[in-house]
């Protein structure tokens, strides 16, 4: 508390020092100097007080952040980050991490849960090991392998800070010829307490330890937000540009398992001579805004509209364009162990072709696929009593999406241009949410497509969170339910390219999920369980012999999935034993393959080198999953597909690291895959035929600047 003495009065008011009190004091014309009475008027040589110089320019009072989106505890933070909802008048607060927690994990596909199964290196695609974390993209699914890199409206970051914030990160590894690089820069600044802008740029990629595996993955998000007392607007521009050389994986697992090649660049790959390459381009613009209409008289005591009855009217628009260009030339590869002679010796077989079909041109491919989406939403949100009430908000909205698809067809030889297919989908949605103090948080939602493209699609969802306290420690029990009926993606039914052609008629998928979790954050404990049932599952799988004979398949029946997840970080003094374990069961591994056990273990010792100045962590990270028929990856389709030829797993992938935080700077030194050649069976694959990186040294630095 402070004692603020008012000028010209003997009153003394004791009050809490917060934005709400200061604003009201300013409105009443009171002195808001945090240090009491301002300096007295200066005296002349005779000791007489001089008259202050009259000024016609009055200092403008700066309004504090009054938005109903943020609670008092969030406003008190020096910097915070959030994402905006596409459908509703809501935001989702996200952590702004500047600690040592997991900064050493430079591959984004390894940061959540037990991580993903990656194709290989930084910038390349991956698929989550946990089935319930896998992306379910109806729009341009070709980009889904890069889900952990891509910016879009759902994850474009907005910031609010009391001081300008700049953070730079640089990580590199390996020799210059094979180097992986990760450069990130983030700048966020407030124009006023309610208005801010930010720029996030990330460039991640590799020159490739293996032959023909160079990758560039660049992502940028530029956002502007104004979160006023009544009017709010969020706008952003997103660009994703990805270039990948596609080597098609090793000619045989023996090339990795038997360690014949001293350098990974000598490992023979199947598409090296074909010079296969994918280029993905994406531009997206979005704007969502809302205006509040209070249903009660707003007084000076009402700091925000969160505690009043109100109606909010809003509109959201998004334009998103994706394209993918796949190129290659006719090329063959040689398998040095393609067969055996009568004496049991390996015999090389030449002339292997990765693709069996060349529908358009016999010597070269250039397949370009493009998808555009214009989305409009008009929504209303009612706040019957207050935003944190038992019934806090009731939402409803309508919208339509205009989808435009273009690809080459034989008829385009006559017209000289690609034919475009346009489809329009109409939908309506609604939700209701509420709270009971800090102990109960609940919501339910529904979305339906009554007609048009995707007509008949529907989704239902519900969420309940119960929060209690034991000796001051929060205990959180959550449950979720969802049921979704969704149409197949356009490209799953329609594709014409040099290597693949199909015109399918697929039924809608129907999936039901139930999730329960229990968390004790102060003790780093988390338990979770998922149960799912999928009917008419659509997937990529084999339609003939060989890896390239892949097509879209649909399972006529139900598949049941069960997942159990446990996370516990044990701490004994400075020793940390962080454990994450996932168990999964699938009733049909040919349709939805999952490993029985997946684990991420991180054991390290943390200590102060110089108290409150330099803190270090020294330890190791390990990843493991049991053997299963892991998915393969098809470059022309940019898709993971099910296969039953090669089992992958039973290999521990271990890194050793030293990480430190010195004031605002974070640094780390790491040797990745330190156990290569020391222990393990040598099968360091995570995706069929795609080996993980062999050992390499990495170093990184991240520095935050303020003001």
Regions picked out by a protein language model, each given a short descriptive name:
Residues 2, 156-159, 186, 431, ...:
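Residue-level signal for the start and early helices of compact helical domains
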Residues 1-15:
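Single conserved hydrophobic/aromatic residue that forms the stacking wall/gate
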Residues 9-11, 20, 25-26, 37, ...:
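Low-complexity, intrinsically disordered/propeptide-like segments
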Residues 5-8, 208, 700:
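Glycine-centered flexibility sites
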Residues 13, 135-136, 161-163, 272-335, ...:
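Exposed, low-structure sequence patches enriched in small/polar residues
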Residues 17-283, 292-306, 469, 473, ...:
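Membrane-proximal, glycine/serine-rich, low-complexity loop/turn segments characteristic
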């Amino acid at each position: 508390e402070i004692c603020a003495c008012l000028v010209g009065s003997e009153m003394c008011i004791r009050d809490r020092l917060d934005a709400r009190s200061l604003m009201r004091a300013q409105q009443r014309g009171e002195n808001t100097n945090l240090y009491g009475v301002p300096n007295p008027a200066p005296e002349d040589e005779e000791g007489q007080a001089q008259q202050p110089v009259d000024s016609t320019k009055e200092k403008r009072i700066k309004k504090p952040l009054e938005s109903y989106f943020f609670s008092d505890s969030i406003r008190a933070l020096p910097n915070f980050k959030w994402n905006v909802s596409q459908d509703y008048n809501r935001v989702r607060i996200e952590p702004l991490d500047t600690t040592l927690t997991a900064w050493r994990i430079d591959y984004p596909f390894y940061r959540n849960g037990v991580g993903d199964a990656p194709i290989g290196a930084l910038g390349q695609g991956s698929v989550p090991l946990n089935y319930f974390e896998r992306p379910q993209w109806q729009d341009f699914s070709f980009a889904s392998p890069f889900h952990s890199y891509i910016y879009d409206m759902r994850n474009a970051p907005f910031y609010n800070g009391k001081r300008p914030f700049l953070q730079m990160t640089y990580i590199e590894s390996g020799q210059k010829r094979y180097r992986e690089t990760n450069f990130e820069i983030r700048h966020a600044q407030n124009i006023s307490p309610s208005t801010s802008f930010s720029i996030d740029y990330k460039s991640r990629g590799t020159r490739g330890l293996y032959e023909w595996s160079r990758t560039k993955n660049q992502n940028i998000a530029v956002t502007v937000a104004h979160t006023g007392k009544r009017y709010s607007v969020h706008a952003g521009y997103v660009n994703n540009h990805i270039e990948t050389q596609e080597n098609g994986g090793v000619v045989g697992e023996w090339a990795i398992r038997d360690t014949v090649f001293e350098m990974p660049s000598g490992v023979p790959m199947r598409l090296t001579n074909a010079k296969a390459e994918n280029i993905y381009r994406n531009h997206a613009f979005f704007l969502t805004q809302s205006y509040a209409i209070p249903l009660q008289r707003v007084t000076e005591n009402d700091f925000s509209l969160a505690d009043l009855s109100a109606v909010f009217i809003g509109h959201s628009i998004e334009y998103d364009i994706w394209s993918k260009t796949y190129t290659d030339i006719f090329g063959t590869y040689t398998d040095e162990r393609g067969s055996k002679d009568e004496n049991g010796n390996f015999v090389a077989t030449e002339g292997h072709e990765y693709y069996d079909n060349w529908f358009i041109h016999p010597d070269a491919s250039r397949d370009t696929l493009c998808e555009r989406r214009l989305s409009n939403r008009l929504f209303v949100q009612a706040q019957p009593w207050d935003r944190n009430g038992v019934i806090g908000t009731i939402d409803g909205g309508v919208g339509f999406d205009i989808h435009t698809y273009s690809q080459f067809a034989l008829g385009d030889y006559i017209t000289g241009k690609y034919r475009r297919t346009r489809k329009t989908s109409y939908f309506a949605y609604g939700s209701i949410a509420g709270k009971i103090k800090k102990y109960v948080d609940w919501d339910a939602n529904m979305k339906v497509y009554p007609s048009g493209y995707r007509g008949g699609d529907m989704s239902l969802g519900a969420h309940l969170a119960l929060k209690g306290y034991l000796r001051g420690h929060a205990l959180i029990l959550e449950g979720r339910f969802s049921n979704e009926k969704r149409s197949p993606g356009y490209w799953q039914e329609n594709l014409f390219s040099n290597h693949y052609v199909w015109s399918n008629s697929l039924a809608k998928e129907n999936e039901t999920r139930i999730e329960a979790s229990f968390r004790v954050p102060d003790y780093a404990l988390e338990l979770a369980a998922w149960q799912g049932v999928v009917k008419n599952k659509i997937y990529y799988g084999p339609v003939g012999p060989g890896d390239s004979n892949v097509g879209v398949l649909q399972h006529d029946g139900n598949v049941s999935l069960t997942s159990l997840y446990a996370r516990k970080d044990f701490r004994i003094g400075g020793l940390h034993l962080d454990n994450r374990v996932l168990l999964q069961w699938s009733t049909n591994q040919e349709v939805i393959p999952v490993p029985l056990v997946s684990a991420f273990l991180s054991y390290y010792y943390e200590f102060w080198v110089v108290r409150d100045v330099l803190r270090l962590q020294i330890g190791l990270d390990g990843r493991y999953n049991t053997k299963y028929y892991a998915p393969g990856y098809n470059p022309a389709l940019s898709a993971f597909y099910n296969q039953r030829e090669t089992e992958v797993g039973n290999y521990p992938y271990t890194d050793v690291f030293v990480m430190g935080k010195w004031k605002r700077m974070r640094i780390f030194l790491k040797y990745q895959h330190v156990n290569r050649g020391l222990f393990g069976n040598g099968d360091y694959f995570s995706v069929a035929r795609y080996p993980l990186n062999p050992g390499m040294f990495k170093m990184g630095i991240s520095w935050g600047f303020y003001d």
